[in-house]
């Protein structure tokens, strides 16, 4: 999980808790889901946290949560946004692979080294998490005073404008960060360490994403910014731009940054994003609304709460809430833009629980006393396994994943053939390996693969397995039906149908079931040496001597007899 470094003194100052000791602060942070991992060489706290709360990737976000926890703040405080003075114009030449952009201006900052480090850390942590290592969203932070914009928007309104467009890889030059030479974008990918790291994100594009002002190219997203607009401790006004593959993602990343800089006293100024056919005003700091029922909150947490208490707890979580008492008691909950983790009413219930204090919840024994025990199926499985071992079989546990070649081709079957009552195998959409493309529909092919891999060992080899098999069944909620299958093989120079049947009948006797073996045909077995397994009048499997074609496919030089049947056929 992500680890964030936080200056404890900075955290105390922002959260207005200067009197808190380190131990008290660590306990309060743990209550927020932030676990203390240690201290850096500079004395900063290293905090690990669940990656759902991305607004806590910076000291400003953590301090905000502590202020709510201590009651210093309540409800939602949306930073004021001044009217747009700048426009990002999106040109038609922008690569289709990265078509979206957003931005904001932040003025009046007074960044020292600690604050600048916090901003850089927030940028990089957002890249690593929500931005999917810059693939889904990348952030550029620039010194606004170094930009020169001009022109007007497509709607005719005057504006200082920069342009997001495509650039030829060997086209315009700029000086990238941490460099002193002008380079084309292609040269950046070849010669700059950051270009080598993130070059794969634009690999194969005819035109690379680029951002221009009136002076020229100053940003090559998602790879690197130009040195002309580099931010340092003397910078007071920032221009923030984000590009990506999804508008919602980069807008939410921008909201998290704007809230963090607003906590530093920054004044947010909107930016118009001109797509030609539409113009967006960003940042989008508007709230969203979700509804949660009072009954759901009480049932999930196991506590009785008054409606006013729930509203109070939600406001202490940084949310706004209004109770609706008409009919079932529900709450209309407003969620700030930086809370990208609130996707479902369950997330709101979690906030109520944390504000209430999970340590305050009192465990209670259930009204109905129950005694745990093993499932009957598990008991049966163990009993059959012990019986197989007693009959001389070696117990195996094979992979449930296999390939259609192993299931069908090497067993002399076509996909339409019936292998022990199996249905069509469940297939893997994007298999990691061609050896594991389907879930097995019967277990005998797995045992033959083991025999194939052990031809160098002495015979006899008597192997058995009780394992899961599956088939497509559209009547099931998952479209897949699973059951446990019992399979065994006898491999030796004198292996025969009679050897396998004797073991099968011994299993039937041990469990008090009537097993009959009427003759049948099966492509995997020798004609006339194959039978169906019928248990208490119900077809359950197959038994026989494996066909020479199957033995040759598996490089086996001794006869093999085998059987397979459904485990649940032995149940009472």
Swiss-Prot record:
It comes from the Archaea. This is Phenylalanine--tRNA ligase beta subunit. NCBIfam families: pheT_arch (TIGR00471). Its EC number is 6.1.1.20. SUPFAM superfamilies: Class II aaRS and biotin synthetases, Putative DNA-binding domain. One of its GO terms (cellular component) is phenylalanine-tRNA ligase complex. CDD domains: PheRS_beta_core (cd00769). It is found in: Cytoplasm. GO terms for biological process: phenylalanyl-tRNA aminoacylation. Mg(2+) binds at residues 341, 347, 350-351. Tetramer of two alpha and two beta subunits. GO terms for molecular function: ATP binding; magnesium ion binding; phenylalanine-tRNA ligase activity; RNA binding. It is an enzyme of class 6 (ligase). Keywords: Aminoacyl-tRNA synthetase, ATP-binding, Cytoplasm, Ligase, Magnesium, Metal-binding, Nucleotide-binding, Protein biosynthesis. Residues 285-363 form the B5 domain. Belongs to the phenylalanyl-tRNA synthetase beta subunit family. Type 2 subfamily. It comes from Natronomonas pharaonis (strain ATCC 35678 / DSM 2160 / CIP 103997 / JCM 8858 / NBRC 14720 / NCIMB 2260 / Gabara) (Halobacterium pharaonis). Its cofactor is Mg(2+). It catalyses: tRNA(Phe) + L-phenylalanine + ATP = L-phenylalanyl-tRNA(Phe) + AMP + diphosphate + H(+).
């Amino acid at each position: 999980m992500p680890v964030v470094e936080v200056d404890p003194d900075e955290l105390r100052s922002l959260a207005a808790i200067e009197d808190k000791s380190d131990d008290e602060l660590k306990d309060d942070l743990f209550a927020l889901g932030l676990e203390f991992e240690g201290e850096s060489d500079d004395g900063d706290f290293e905090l690990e946290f669940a990656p759902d709360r991305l607004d806590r990737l910076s000291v400003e976000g953590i301090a905000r949560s502590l202020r709510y926890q201590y009651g210093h703040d309540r409800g939602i405080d949306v930073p004021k946004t001044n009217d747009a003075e700048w426009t990002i114009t999106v040109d038609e030449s922008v690569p289709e692979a990265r078509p979206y952009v957003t931005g904001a201006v932040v003025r009046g900052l007074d960044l020292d080294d600690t604050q600048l480090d916090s901003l850089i850390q927030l940028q990089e942590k957002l890249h690593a998490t929500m931005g999917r290592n810059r693939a889904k969203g990348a952030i550029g932070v620039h010194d606004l005073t170094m930009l020169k914009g001009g022109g007007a928007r497509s709607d005719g309104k005057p504006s200082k404008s920069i342009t997001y467009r495509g650039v030829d890889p060997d086209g315009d030059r700029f000086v990238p960060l941490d460099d002193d030479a002008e380079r084309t974008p292609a040269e950046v990918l070849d010669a700059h360490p950051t270009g080598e790291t993130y070059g794969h994100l634009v690999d194969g594009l005819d035109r690379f994403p680029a951002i221009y002002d009136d002076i020229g190219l100053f940003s090559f997203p998602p790879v690197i910014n130009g040195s002309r607009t580099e931010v340092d401790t003397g910078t007071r006004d920032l221009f923030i731009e984000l590009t990506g593959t999804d508008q919602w993602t980069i807008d939410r990343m921008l909201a998290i940054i704007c809230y963090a800089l607003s906590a530093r006293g920054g004044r947010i100024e909107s930016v118009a994003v001109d797509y030609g056919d539409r113009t967006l005003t960003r940042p989008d700091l508007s709230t969203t609304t979700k509804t949660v029922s009072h009954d759901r909150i009480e049932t999930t947490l196991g506590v009785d709460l008054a409606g006013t208490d729930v509203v109070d707890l939600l406001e202490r979580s940084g949310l706004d809430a209004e109770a609706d008492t008409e009919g079932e008691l529900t709450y209309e909950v407003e969620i700030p833009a930086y809370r990208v983790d609130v996707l479902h009413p369950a997330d709101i219930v979690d906030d109520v629980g944390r504000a209430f204090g999970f340590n305050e919840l009192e465990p209670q024994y259930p009204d109905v006393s129950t005694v745990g025990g093993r499932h009957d199926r598990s008991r049966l499985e163990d009993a059959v396994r012990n019986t197989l071992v007693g009959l001389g079989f070696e117990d195996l546990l094979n992979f449930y994943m296999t390939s259609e070649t192993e299931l069908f081709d090497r067993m002399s079957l076509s996909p339409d053939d019936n292998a022990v009552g199996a249905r069509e195998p469940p297939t893997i959409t994007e298999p990691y390996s061609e050896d594991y493309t389907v879930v097995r529909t019967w277990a005998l092919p797995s045992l033959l693969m083991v025999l194939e891999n052990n031809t160098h060992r002495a015979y006899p080899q008597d192997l058995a397995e009780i394992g899961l098999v599956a088939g497509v069944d559209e009547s099931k909620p998952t479209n897949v039906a699973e059951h446990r299958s019992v399979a065994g093989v006898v491999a030796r120079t004198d292996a025969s149908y009679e050897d396998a049947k004797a073991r099968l009948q011994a299993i039937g006797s041990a469990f008090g079931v009537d097993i009959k073996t009427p003759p049948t045909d099966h492509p995997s077995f020798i004609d006339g040496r194959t039978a169906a397994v019928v248990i208490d009048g119900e077809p359950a499997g197959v038994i026989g001597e494996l066909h020479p074609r199957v033995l040759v496919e598996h490089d086996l030089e001794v006869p093999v007899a085998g059987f397979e049947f459904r485990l649940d056929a032995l149940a009472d």
